[in-house]
Curated annotation (Swiss-Prot):
GO terms for biological process: negative regulation of DNA-templated transcription. The lineage of its organism: Bacteria, Bacillati, Bacillota, Bacilli, Bacillales. It comes from Bacillus subtilis (strain 168). It comes from the Bacteria. This is Uncharacterized HTH-type transcriptional regulator YmfC. Keywords: DNA-binding, Transcription, Transcription regulation. Transmembrane segments: none annotated. The gene is ymfC.
Length: 241
C-alpha cells in the first residue's frame, strides 16, 4: 500500500506505517528490513524521505542500523523503570512477572582502593566484602553486578545467597537502604561483560554506578550494575521548580 494519499508530511506517514508493520508482525524483532530501494518502492516514497523516517525511528529505538549490514527491528525492552524510584534488581525482575535468579562468579574480602576509602569513610586497615555475580530473569542473563560492602557493618559469619543485596544488608547488618546517588554511563561492547550477558556485538550496555545510603545517611553499599540496553529502559520524572 502506498502512502501517497495521506496529506501529512511523507516521512511521518512512513514512520507510522513501519511501526504498524512491526506491531502487526510483518517485521519481527531483530529481523532485517528490506533494502532502502525495496522499501521506498513499496511505500511509494523517495529514498530521501525514507532515510529521514529511518533516522527518527532509530532515535526512538524502534530500529537499529548496522553500517554495511542493514537495518533491523530493535528488540523491545523487557523492563521499564523510573530511575527516580530505587528498587533492587530482584524487585525489578519480579515486577516484570519474571523469576529472578543469580549466577555467582566470585566473592572475596579485599583492601579498599583510595576511592573506596573516601566513599565509605573507612579507617586504616578496614576491609571490603566484594561480590561479583550475574542476575537472570527466567534464566536469561540481563545484569552484571559488582557490589562492595564495608566488612565492619557485617557479622563475622553471614550468607550472601540472598537474591537481593538490600535484603542481605537488612538481615545481616540492620541497614535499610533509603536512597542512592547514581551516575549513569552508556557504554558499548565490553570484552569481558558483554559475552557473559550473551550480548550481540552491537548491543550496548548501560552502567549504573550507585552509592547506597542507609536510614542514618551512612554509605553502606557501592554497586556497579551493567544492564543490557536492549532489555532495560529507564526514564526520569523531572519537575519544574
Amino acid at each position: 500500500m502506498s502512502t501517497k494519499a495521506d496529506n501529512r508530511h511523507l516521512y511521518l506517514k512512513v514512520i507510522e506505517r513501519i511501526k504498524e508493520d512491526i506491531k502487526n508482525g510483518i517485521y519481527t524483532e531483530k529481523e532485517k528490513l528490506p533494502s532502502e530501494f525495496e522499501l521506498s518502492k513499496k511505500l511509494g516514497v523517495s529514498r530521501a524521505t525514507l532515510r529521514e523516517a529511518l533516522r527518527i525511528l532509530e532515535e526512538e529505538h524502534v530500529i537499529i542500523r548496522r553500517h554495511g549490514v542493514g537495518t533491523f527491528v530493535h528488540s523491545k525492552p523487557l523492563f521499564l523503570s523510573g530511575i527516580e524510584q530505587l528498587n533492587s534488581v530482584t524487585k525489578m525482575i519480579e515486577q516484570a512477572n519474571m523469576t529472578p535468579g543469580t549466577i555467582f562468579l566470585s566473592s572475596q574480602v579485599l583492601m579498599p582502593s583510595e576511592d573506596d576509602t573516601k566513599r565509605f569513610h573507612l579507617a586504616e586497615g578496614q576491609e571490603l566484602f566484594y561480590l561479583e555475580r550475574v542476575r537472570t530473569a527466567d534464566g536469561q542473563p540481563i545484569v552484571y553486578c559488582i557490589d562492595k560492602i564495608p566488612m565492619n557493618i557485617l557479622p563475622n559469619s553471614f550468607s550472601h545467597q540472598q537474591e537481593s543485596m538490600f535484603d542481605l544488608l537488612e538481615k545481616n547488618s540492620g541497614s535499610v537502604i533509603s536512597y542512592a546517588v547514581t551516575d549513569i554511563e552508556p557504554i558499548g561492547y565490553h570484552d569481558t561483560i558483554s559475552p557473559v550477558l550473551e550480548c550481540d556485538p552491537e548491543t550496548a550496555l548501560l552502567l549504573l554506578k550507585q552509592t547506597h545510603y542507609d536510614q542514618h545517611d551512612k554509605p553502606v553499599l557501592y554497586s556497579l550494575n551493567y544492564f543490557r540496553a536492549d532489555k532495560f529502559r529507564f526514564h526520569v520524572l523531572r519537575k519544574r521548580f
